[in-house]
Every structure is written in structure tokens, then in C-alpha cells.
Curated annotation (Swiss-Prot):
Gene Ontology MF annotations: 3-(3-hydroxyphenyl)propionate hydroxylase activity; FAD binding
Family to which this protein belongs: Belongs to the PheA/TfdB FAD monooxygenase family.
Record-given protein name: 3-(3-hydroxy-phenyl)propionate/3-hydroxycinnamic acid hydroxylase
Function: Catalyzes the insertion of one atom of molecular oxygen into position 2 of the phenyl ring of 3-(3-hydroxyphenyl)propionate (3-HPP) and hydroxycinnamic acid (3HCI).
Keywords: Aromatic hydrocarbons catabolism, FAD, Flavoprotein, NAD, Oxidoreductase
Transmembrane domains' residue ranges: none
Cofactor: FAD
The keyword DNA damage is assigned to this record: no
Enzyme class: oxidoreductase
SUPFAM superfamilies: FAD/NAD(P)-binding domain
Amino acid sequence: MIAPGPRATDHDTDVLVVGAGPVGLTLANILGLQGIRTVVVEERDTLIDYPRGVGLDDEALRTFQSIGLVERVLPHTVPNQILRFMDAKRRVLAEMAPPDARFGWPKRNGFVQPLVDAELLAGLDRFAHVQVRWGSPMTGCREDADGVNVELGADGGNVGDGGGDGHPARLRARYVVGCDGGRSMTRRVMGVSFDGTTSSTRWLVVDIANDPLGHPNSEVGADPERPYASISIAHGIRRFEFMIHADESDEQAEDPEFLTRMLARMVPHPDRVDVIRRRVYTHHSRIAGEFRRGRLLLAGDAAHLMPVWQGQGYNSGIRDAANLGWKLAAVVSGRAGDKLLDTYDMERRKHARAMIDLSTMVGRVISPTNRRVAGARDLLVRSASIVPTLKRYVLEMRFKPMPRYEQGAVVHANPGRADSPVGTLFIQPRVDTRDQQDVLLDDVLGPWFAVLCWNNNPRKILGETAFANWKALGARFFALRPATQLHWTGHDDPDVVVVGDRRGDLKSWFDTHAESVLFLRPDRCIAGACIAQRAPDLSAALFDALTLTPRGGDPQSGTGSVLYVAQPAPESSGAVAGPA
């Protein structure tokens, strides 16, 4: 750690993000859209140019939609990708092909991570108040009551004191978020544990251009002789993964002849493939003891590591950014108290732990090398697939843990109710307004808080005081109606947007819930829900629980009044090869 310096009352930046990987870049885009001064520091000189993650889920795409970049990301994806689990004879044991898109996007998508990460980086060009500093490792930091003094390695850039001339640079930030991977320097500085296990099993991972198979889907081979995976990414790239046996060394596995033998099971000409990259790796199942300590926080691999079998490492990190980003923006802009940041650990830890456990369990199911154990597993899986409900359970990925916050930045009017929608993500159907037709709901709601009422005017339901408080916070208001009532003007209000239920999805949602008034957080989690008559009381409870301040804004920040930077019209762009 660096020695304590004089306490300053000003800050070089509001938030310092350590690490320019997908989590750090997503977080910086969220903060950028909210007008928060942000500096991203990265020890590398450029983005990592090889794939690591290979699957995006619907929640990640919804987050990219929220930062105005989904149209740039989509060209690098394979939507609705099917995953098949095969036995030793390459017969299908189980299949995952979830059909619904309740959050607006397909649940399974292959993608090319370097190209998607490059789009996230290019998105930061929209914000003069967001900077990226390459070749700038964080070497230490010290927190005081008002901020964090951070020391960067030589050539640490030109923000703050020093840097750019071979000497260490110092920056002062209100908060520091470590998105710096499994070997996180931020986590070490915080002094928190990283408990869990590292598997003794090793895998050879090979990325190949000009896909020798060419089909759009993926398979996992639960072959006791040698478990494997074959994954279609996008743009003609395929990943193969092969288990390395205990009596095989890393050197053997990295020999081209070894790869040729492995690929011979999959393609007719294994010696005629274009290898992009190969490496040997192991799986980790670990989680940090704390995601927050004072003004330092962790996200992504710095906070948790999980095996690859559910493709949730990348997506879990994007969930972290979506959960933390709006909370940091609210606190830094003076619209919420610092205690709101405590809810980040409360909400994300349980779900991250569930994803780690699921990924670890799936790895154990597919990778036994004992033939009797594998045979018993195959029999059990096939027997289960005969039962329609069990088959749908796997096919539709119903086993995937969904975020459901029982405590945190939520208010449960009836904590014991298992069917309460509070703490879950709201659906995202396609809707109509009087100005737009057939648009995704989030594009209507905007990037901040939203108050939704079915068949009612939010102002009348909330009352003038509560309505004014939400309006001062920057929230928007929506009256949800059947499409037949979209153009009826009898209850028009200049502060309320009328939304037409284009396909009946909204009514179907309200059909299954008693609540008719919803308070949505910026990450589209339902913070509170109630019947219309209880709305004023729930509104007051939410302001208290989330420590919200209607007319917030820190005069020292210079960003307190900025809650939304208008986005350009969505447009697809070509691949971005490196940092802008």
C-alpha cells in the first residue's frame, strides 16, 4: 500500500475502475450514461485479443441494450444456440434449447468475446467524462473518510499527479471498483479472502478459425474415455475442449500431435485446421469473502470464479456491473446514501454462489471417466427425459438460478410470499406508444427508475407528494394499458407515458400477480410492488430502504444533476480491432 498522503477534499475522478475487461468496460458505460466521472486503468496495453467467454445470455444482452450498444454487439453473436449433451456414442442425452425470450433476448447466444469487448470499449468514446488508461497497473491504494488515494505503476497516464514520464501516478477517487480478474490486486489490497477450490482436472482448449464442422450449435461429450466440448462461437470460429488425463503432462497436451489425435474424433482431416490459440487450464470455484469493504468494491472474476459448464462466468460479471453501476451513480450524484452500496454484496453473493454450485455440479456430471458411473448417469438422464415435465425442465433451462433478492435494495410487503414478484427481473415485451410501435419495453422506460401502473394514472395513485419525489429523483412514469386503449386521451397526463400492450404480454404478467403498481430499479429489478391503494405507503418505504434523496446532488461532484446522457440512434458497426 502507498503511504497516506494529505487528505484532499477534491477528487480526480468519482469512480476508478481497475481492469478494462468486459465487466470494467460495462460498468464504465453505465456510469458514463449517468454522467459520472470515471477512469478505467488497465495494466495491459490493449484489449485481450483471444476469446475466453463463449456464451451470452438474455440478461447480458439486456444490459448491453441498456447502455445503447446491443445493436453493435449482435453482429458478433449466434442467437438461439442449441446445446446438446452426448454420450460416448454421440447419441443425445439431453438438449438445451430454451424457446422463450421473456427479457427481450434469446437465452443462449454464442459470441466472439474480443469483438464484443471492443464494442464496449468503443462505446466509451461517447463520454468526455470517461477515460481509459492503458499500461497503468494499480500498485496500491489507501482509503480515508472522503475517498481513496490510488497509486498506479510507471506511465500511469496523465490524470492526477505524476505519470506519463516513467514515474508513478496518483489519483484520488470517491470509490474504486476492482474488475481485475481472478488474481485481483484490488482484492489483495482489500485483504479479503478468496475461498473455494481449484479442480485437479486439466483441459486443453483450442480455438479454430474456418470452422471445420460449420454447424451453428454446440455439444458437450460426456464420454468416459475423454470428455470433450465442441462450441460454435461466431464468424467461423469453433472451440474444442478436451480433458487431459492425470498421466498426460501439460507439455504432451500442448504438442501438435496430441491435438491432431483429439480432433480426429471430430473431423476427417485434423491436420488441416487453422489454430488461433491453444492453452491448458483448470476450473476454479471461488468467491470473495466480501464484495465491498469501505470505498473499495469487487466485480466479475475478482469477486467470483466458476467452471465454464454453464457459460456463466462472463454473464455473472455483467450482472455485477448492472447491479452495482446504478447504485454507484445514485450515491456519487447525491441521490442515495452510501449504505445503498451495502446491498450490492447482499444481492449478488447468493446468486453468484448458486451459479458456482450449478456450474461445478454440471462439470461433475459430464466428466466421470469411470464407465460404470458414466453408464448409470446415462441411464438416469434418459429415464428422466421420458417424463415431459423433466424434459422441459432441461430443454428450457429452468434449472438456471434466476436472481431473486429477498433483501437489499427492495421492499417486500409480504416477505413470506413465495410468488411475490419483488426482487425479480421484470419482463421485457414488445410494446407500442403513441410515438413508437413494436419497441422493446426498456427502450421506452429509459435508463433510470420507472413507476408502472396497470390501467391507472401513476400520479393519481401515488398522490402529489410521492409523485413529486419520484419525479425529482429522475424517475419516469408509465400507464400500461391494453392496446385498444392506447389512443384514448381521457386520463392524459404530461408526465405520464401511455404504453400499449401490443401482444398481451403485460396483461398476462399481471394476470398471474395480485400487484398492479411496480417500482422498477434501473437494472429492471422490481424494487417494490403493490395494489394501487398501497402505493403511497410503499413509495415512502422504498425511499427509506434505498436511502433515496429526491433532490440530491453533491456540489463537489460536478455530476450530481446529470442522470442521463442521450444515446445516438442504434446502429450496427464493424469489428473494432483494438482500443479506440
